[in-house]
């Protein structure tokens, strides 16, 4: 049983092992002896009847299946040992195929190889690192956004703009024919939410309540209804209302008269909001760069993955899909009828999603392998200043990896301009956060001193 045969393909490795008929018979006899002892025949004690009578009550096919199953499990440990010794890049996703031969059985252990990425051309990538410092305008806009969260909307006669909620009736046509699901009354839509197909919401900007007209937009190639993909649709629109958040402006009398509107409180709030924005932009800037880079690279790389691995991921995505349908109390069959799709169409979509998830993940792993930088002591010290300023007592490994990949990539691909901008940004980050922390400390000290001064004044009055 020690003769292994290895067959390699691009995505899988098959380990074949031949087990002779004699070996199978030997194992069969062992199990048969144990099984016969437990069989009862009327007129005899358990296992004491003639062997012919006992065997007549034995399911030999089930017994042989058990023998082969046992041999399969026993041999699997040896297969794993062989794979480790050969340092084969395989995953734990596998199947076992059994083939009966004239003089025995062949066990084929098929393993999914670790997915591979090739033709990774990072130097030609167009994705740029965008670094933005936090301005006073950013701080004020962020404060207003936070203040206006959850505030009610009011009808306006103005032209609709991004962020407004519009109420309208619509009816859609493809090739002059009304299409299913393309009609609604009193439909509510927040402009800029990207709830409709690309190009639809933009054409409602600048329109006032009472406007009637047509909008044309093309369904994307990935649209969930297969029959509508890449087709232009014409929508008849009746715009009934434009609703806008009854926003609270920082320079309004309403805000200035509120407890939050005092100059002292607003000044303190600005400091905390600015620090929050500085920290979030630092983290988001490098994360966005790597995410966009990975997406760009995914369009051109060659990706090799076994269907064995995809099978597990597809099953997982299929379960998520079913859970979502249950959440909305929609039966799968009814959903398929609405989107005019078959079960095969759904499986194709799930497989595409599974491949894409794996692809993005393994492209990032390749970037880690190729570009992850080992920081010098001086660079570690510099980043420690950044983390201290960010109040990160122990930054996550993910963040450290992202920073190491970012710097290594900028250096190895000769992006000197972006590398300088990144290094300057780190200096700005430390200086800005130290300045803000100093302001916060000063405010806190002032707050602790004020009650003490009040107590002194009270004693003097007495």
Swiss-Prot record:
The keyword Cell division applies. One of its GO terms (cellular component) is cytoplasm. Keywords: Cell cycle, Cell division, Chaperone, Cytoplasm, Isomerase, Rotamase. It is found in: Cytoplasm. Belongs to the FKBP-type PPIase family. Tig subfamily. Consists of 3 domains; the N-terminus binds the ribosome, the middle domain has PPIase activity, while the C-terminus has intrinsic chaperone activity on its own. Involved in protein export. Acts as a chaperone by maintaining the newly synthesized protein in an open conformation. Functions as a peptidyl-prolyl cis-trans isomerase. This is Trigger factor. It comes from Mycoplasmopsis synoviae (strain 53). The gene is tig.
């Amino acid at each position: 049983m020690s003769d292994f045969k290895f067959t390699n393909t691009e995505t899988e490795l098959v380990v074949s092992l031949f087990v002779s008929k004699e070996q199978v018979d030997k194992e069969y006899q062992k199990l048969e002896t144990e099984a016969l002892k437990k069989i009862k025949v009327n007129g005899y004690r358990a296992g004491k009847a003639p062997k012919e009578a006992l065997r007549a009550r034995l399911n030999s096919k089930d017994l042989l299946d058990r023998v082969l199953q046992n041999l399969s499990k026993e041999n699997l440990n040896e297969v794993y040992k062989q794979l480790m010794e050969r340092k084969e890049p395989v995953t734990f996703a596998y199947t076992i195929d059994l083939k009966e031969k004239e003089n025995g059985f062949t066990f084929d252990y098929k393993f999914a190889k670790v997915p591979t990425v090739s033709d990774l051309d990072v130097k030609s990538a167009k994705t740029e690192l965008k670094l933005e410092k936090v301005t006073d305008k950013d701080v004020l806009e962020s404060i207003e956004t936070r203040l206006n969260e959850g505030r009610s909307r009011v009808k306006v006669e103005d032209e609709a703009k991004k962020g407004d909620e519009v109420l309208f009736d619509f009816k859609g046509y493809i090739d002059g024919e009304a299409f299913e699901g393309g009609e609604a009354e009193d439909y509510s839509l927040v402009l800029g939410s990207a709830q409709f197909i690309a190009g639809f919401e933009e054409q409602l900007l600048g329109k006032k309540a009472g406007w009637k007209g047509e909008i044309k937009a093309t369904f994307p190639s990935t649209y969930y209804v297969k029959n509508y993909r890449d087709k232009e649709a014409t929508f008849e629109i009746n715009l009934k209302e434009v609703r806008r958040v009854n926003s609270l402006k920082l320079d309004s009398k309403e805000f200035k008269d509120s407890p939050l509107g005092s100059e002292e409180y607003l000044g303190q709030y600005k400091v905390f909001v600015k620090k929050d924005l500085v920290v979030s932009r630092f983290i988001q800037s490098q994360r966005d760069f790597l995410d966009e880079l990975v997406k760009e690279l995914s369009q051109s790389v060659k990706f090799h993955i076994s269907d064995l691995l995809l099978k597990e991921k597809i099953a997982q995505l299929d379960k998520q899909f079913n859970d979502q349908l249950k959440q909305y109390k929609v039966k799968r069959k009814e959903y398929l009828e609405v989107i005019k799709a078959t079960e095969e169409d759904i499986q194709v979509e799930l497989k595409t999603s599974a491949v894409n998830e794996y692809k993005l993940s393994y492209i990032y792993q390749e970037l880690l392998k190729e570009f992850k930088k080992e920081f010098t002591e001086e660079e570690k010290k510099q980043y420690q200043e950044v983390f201290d300023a960010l109040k990160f007592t122990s930054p996550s490994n993910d963040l450290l990896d992202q920073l190491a990949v970012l710097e290594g990539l900028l250096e190895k691909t000769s992006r000197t301009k972006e590398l300088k901008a990144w290094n300057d940004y780190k200096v700005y980050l430390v200086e800005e956060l130290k300045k803000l922390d100093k302001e916060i400390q000063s405010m806190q000290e002032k707050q602790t001193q004020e009650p003490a001064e009040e107590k002194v004044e009270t004693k003097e009055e007495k």
